[in-house]
C-alpha cells in the first residue's frame, strides 16, 4: 500500500533492496521511536477514516472508526464485515483492514504501508519456510501500518509483522495486487501457532480475496439477458428499448443442420477445434447444392420473421391464439415457398426457351447467308423460305432482308438522300433565324404544313422509344433520326410529317445504315395502306376498317358482337397500330418479328396481327366495358411473348367464303365506287 505523501509513486522494491536514505535504518529507528509512533498513529487514523481517498484506492466505504486519533475497527466490526462481504463495496482497490497488535516501538514510518516481503514472525517454528505458496492458488501479501494482509484464493488473513518485515520489500505496483504480479520466487509465510493463539478470539473469515478471483479491479458488467425471453415485435409497433449484451466483434457463426445460427465469442474458445469438441460436430461449409437450394426455394421475406410474444404492455396470447398464429405463419411460409418454386421454374423455362431460340437463330443465319440471300429472286417464294421466315429473321441479316423485301420502286439513291438532307438543313437554319415568323406562319397554315413543321418533328423525336435513351437529344441516334425525317418532309411535301413516322424510321435506323434506312422508309410509306393512313384518306381508311371487320366477325364472333354492343369501332385501336406498325404497342423484339412477316405478306399481315392480339386477350376483353377496352388496347401488357402471339396469329384464318384478304378488299372497293356513283346520280 502507498502512503498519502507518495502521490501515486511506487513504494515497493525488490527483495533485499534497501530504500535510498535508509541504509542506517537501525540507528535512525532507535533515535526516532517517538516520531515513528506518532506517524503510525496518524496513518492508522488516515486509513480508518471514511471518505478519505488513498493513492491506491478509494476507502470511502471502510467502516467508520472512532472519532479519536488512532481508533481502529474492532474485532466484532471485522467479523461483521467478513460475514457481510457481499455488501461491502471496494470499487477500485481499497482493502478491508482488520485490527492487529502493532509491535511496540515501530519506527518504520511509511515503510509499513508498502507491499513488503513477509518474514517469519516470532511465533513461527524453526525450519518452516518463511514464505509458502501454491502454484495452483497464487497469493500476494501486503502490510498496512503493521497489519500483514495475506490474500489467498479462498480466504483473507491478517497477521502480525515485526519491524524487520519492513526492511525487506518486493517489487509491486499500487494497482498490481493480482496474484500474477507476485515477484518470482516469493510466497506467503505459513501461519504461526503463536499468532493463532493470539487471535483465537477472531475466527477465520472469508475476506476480500474472493473479490480478486472475481476480477475485482475490472469493470463490472450486467449479465446479458437472453434475447429470446425479451418480449417485443421485430417488425410492427413500437418496441421498448431492450438491453442487449455487448457482443465481441469477432463472432464464430456456425450454421447447423436446422438452419439456425449458433455464435460463440472468440475469447471464450481457444480455437476452432475446441469449439468442435464442445459442440460435438465438425465445422464444414455447406455444399454448393445446399446453398443454391436455400437461395432458390427459401423466401427471405417470410422465413426471416421471428415469432415472439406480444409486448409486455399488451395481454398475453392464449394457447389457442398462439397455435392459430403458428398455423397461419406456417401456411404463409408454405405459400411463399410455392411461389418461389413457381418463379424458379418459370425462369428456368424462359432460360431454356432463350437458349433454344439462340440455337435456332444461329442455324438459320447460316442458311440465310449461304443459301437464300445469294439466290433471293428464286428462293424467296419457296415453302422452305416462307416457313423459315415465319420463325423470325436473325438480327444480323434482318436489315438486308427488309431492304430486299420492301424494294426500291421509287429509285431513290444515296445521292438523292444527300440532296434532300441539305435542303432540310437549310430549312432548319432559316427556321432558327426566323423562329417567330415561322410560328406565325404555322398558325395560319394548313394542317399538312403544320405537321410538316420542324417543331413537330422535334417534339415527336423526344417521345420515340424513351426507355432506350438513344433517340432523345444527346443520344447517339438523335441527329440521324432528325436527318431522315427532315429529308423525307422535303422529299414528300404532299405527305409531310405525321406523328408515328418517327417510330418507323427509328426501327429502320436500328437495322440499316443511314442511306439504306431512308430508302426503305420512303418506299415503305409509299405502300397503299401506309399512304392512305399517313395522307389521312378517310374513304380508304374506312374501306380497310370494313375489310378488317369482315374477318373479325369470321374469326371472333363473340368478341365482335361484344364490341358492337358498346359501339366500339376499329378506328379506336387500329389507327395507332397501323401508324406505328406495332413498334409502339408491342415490345421492340416482338415488333421486329411482326415486321419480318409483314415484309413477307404485306399489309394483310398487319390486320391479321390485330386479330391475333384480340384473340389472345379475348377472355379478358369480354369482361370489360367500352372505356376499359379502349384503354387496354391502347396500352397492351408488356409481358406478351412472341410464342403466344404468333400462336394466336397462326390460328386466324384470313378467308371469308373462300375469299382472301385481297379479294374481300377489292369487292369492298367496287361496292364503295358503285355507292358513290349512285349517290352522285341521285343528286343530279
UniProtKB/Swiss-Prot annotation:
Tree of life domain: Eukaryota
Biased composition (Basic and acidic residues): 172-183, 240-250
Protein keywords: Coiled coil, GTPase activation
Compositional bias per record (Acidic residues), positions renumbered to this chain: 25-34
PROSITE patterns linked to this entry: TBC_RABGAP (PS50086)
PANTHER family: RAB GTPASE-ACTIVATING PROTEIN 1-LIKE (PTHR47219), TBC1 DOMAIN FAMILY MEMBER 12 (PTHR47219:SF24)
Function summary: May act as a GTPase-activating protein for Rab family protein(s).
Protein name: TBC1 domain family member 12
Species this chain originates from: Xenopus tropicalis (Western clawed frog)
Amino acid at each position: 500500500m502507498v502512503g498519502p505523501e507518495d502521490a501515486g509513486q511506487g513504494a515497493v522494491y525488490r527483495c533485499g533492496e534497501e530504500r535510498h536514505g535508509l541504509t542506517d535504518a537501525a540507528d535512525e529507528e532507535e533515535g526516532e521511536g517517538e516520531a515513528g509512533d506518532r506517524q503510525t498513529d496518524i496513518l492508522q487514523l488516515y486509513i480508518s477514516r471514511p471518505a478519505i481517498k488513498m493513492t491506491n484506492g478509494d476507502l470511502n466505504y471502510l467502516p467508520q472508526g472512532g472519532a479519536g486519533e488512532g481508533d481502529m475497527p474492532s474485532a466484532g466490526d471485522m467479523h461483521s464485515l467478513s460475514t457481510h462481504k457481499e455488501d461491502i463495496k471496494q470499487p477500485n482497490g481499497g482493502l478491508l483492514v482488520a485490527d492487529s497488535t502493532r509491535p511496540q516501538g515501530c519506527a518504520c514510518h511509511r515503510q509499513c504501508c508498502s507491499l513488503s516481503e513477509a518474514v517469519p514472525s516470532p511465533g513461527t517454528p524453526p525450519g518452516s519456510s518463511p514464505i509458502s505458496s501454491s502454484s495452483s492458488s497464487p497469493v500476494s501479501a501486503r502490510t498496512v501500518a503493521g497489519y500483514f494482509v495475506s490474500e489467498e484464493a479462498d480466504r483473507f488473513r491478517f497477521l502480525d509483522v515485526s519491524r524487520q518485515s519492513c526492511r525487506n520489500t518486493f517489487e509491486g505496483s499500487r494497482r498490481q495486487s493480482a496474484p500474477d504480479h507476485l515477484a518470482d520466487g516469493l510466497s506467503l509465510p505459513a501461519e504461526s501457532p503463536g499468532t493463532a493463539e493470539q487471535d483465537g478470539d477472531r475466527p477465520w473469515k472469508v475476506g476480500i480475496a474472493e473479490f480478486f478471483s472475481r476480477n475485482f479491479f475490472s469493470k463490472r458488467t450486467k449479465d446479458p439477458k437472453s434475447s429470446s425471453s425479451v418480449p417485443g415485435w421485430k417488425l410492427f409497433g413500437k418496441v421498448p428499448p431492450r438491453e442487449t449484451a455487448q457482443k465481441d466483434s469477432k463472432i464464430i457463426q456456425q450454421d447447423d443442420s436446422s438452419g439456425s445460427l449458433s455464435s460463440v465469442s472468440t475469447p471464450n474458445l481457444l480455437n476452432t477445434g475446441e469449439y468442435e469438441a464442445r459442440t460435438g460436430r465438425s465445422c464444414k461449409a455447406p455444399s454448393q447444392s445446399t446453398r443454391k437450394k436455400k437461395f432458390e426455394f427459401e423466401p427471405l421475406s417470410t422465413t426471416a420473421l421471428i415469432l415472439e410474444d406480444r409486448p409486455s404492455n399488451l395481454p398475453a396470447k392464449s394457447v389457442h391464439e398462439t397455435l392459430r398464429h403458428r398455423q397461419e405463419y406456417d401456411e404463409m411460409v408454405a405459400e411463399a415457398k410455392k411461389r418461389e418454386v413457381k418463379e424458379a421454374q418459370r425462369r428456368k423455362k424462359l432460360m431454356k426457351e432463350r437458349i433454344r431460340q439462340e440455337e435456332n437463330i444461329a442455324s438459320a443465319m447460316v442458311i440465310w447467308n449461304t443459301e437464300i440471300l445469294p439466290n433471293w429472286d428464286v428462293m424467296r417464294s419457296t415453302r422452305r423460305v416462307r416457313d423459315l421466315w415465319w420463325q423470325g429473321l436473325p438480327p444480323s441479316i434482318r436489315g438486308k432482308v427488309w431492304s430486299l423485301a420492301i424494294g426500291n420502286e421509287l429509285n431513290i439513291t444515296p445521292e438523292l438522300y444527300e440532296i434532300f438532307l441539305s435542303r432540310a438543313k437549310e430549312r432548319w437554319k432559316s427556321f432558327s433565324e426566323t423562329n417567330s415568323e415561322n410560328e406565325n406562319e404555322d398558325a395560319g397554315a394548313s394542317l399538312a404544313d403544320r405537321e410538316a413543321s420542324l417543331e413537330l418533328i422535334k417534339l415527336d423525336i423526344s417521345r420515340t422509344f424513351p426507355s432506350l435513351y438513344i433517340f432523345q437529344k444527346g443520344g447517339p441516334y438523335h441527329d440521324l433520326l432528325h436527318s431522315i425525317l427532315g429529308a423525307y418532309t422535303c422529299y414528300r411535301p404532299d405527305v409531310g410529317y405525321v406523328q408515328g413516322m418517327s417510330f418507323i424510321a427509328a426501327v429502320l435506323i436500328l437495322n440499316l445504315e443511314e442511306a439504306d434506312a431512308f430508302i426503305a422508309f420512303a418506299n415503305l410509306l409509299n405502300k397503299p395502306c401506309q399512304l392512305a393512313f399517313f395522307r389521312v384518306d378517310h374513304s380508304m381508311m374506312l374501306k380497310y376498317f370494313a375489310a378488317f371487320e369482315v374477318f373479325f366477325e369470321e374469326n371472333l364472333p363473340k368478341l365482335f358482337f361484344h364490341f358492337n354492343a358498346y359501339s366500339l369501332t376499329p378506328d379506336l385501336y387500329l389507327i395507332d397500330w397501323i401508324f406505328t406498325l406495332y413498334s409502339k404497342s408491342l415490345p421492340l423484339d416482338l415488333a421486329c418479328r411482326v415486321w419480318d412477316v409483314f415484309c413477307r405478306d404485306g399489309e394483310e399481315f398487319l390486320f391479321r396481327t390485330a386479330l391475333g392480339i384480340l384473340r389472345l386477350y379475348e377472355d379478358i376483353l369480354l369482361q370489360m366495358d367500352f372505356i376499359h377496352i379502349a384503354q387496354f388496347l391502347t396500352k397492351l401488357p408488356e409481358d406478351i411473348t412472341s410464342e403466344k402471339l404468333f400462336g394466336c396469329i397462326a390460328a386466324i384464318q384470313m378467308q371469308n367464303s373462300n375469299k382472301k384478304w385481297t379479294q374481300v378488299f377489292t369487292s369492298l372497293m367496287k361496292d364503295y365506287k358503285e355507292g358513290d356513283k349512285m349517290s352522285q346520280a341521285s343528286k343530279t
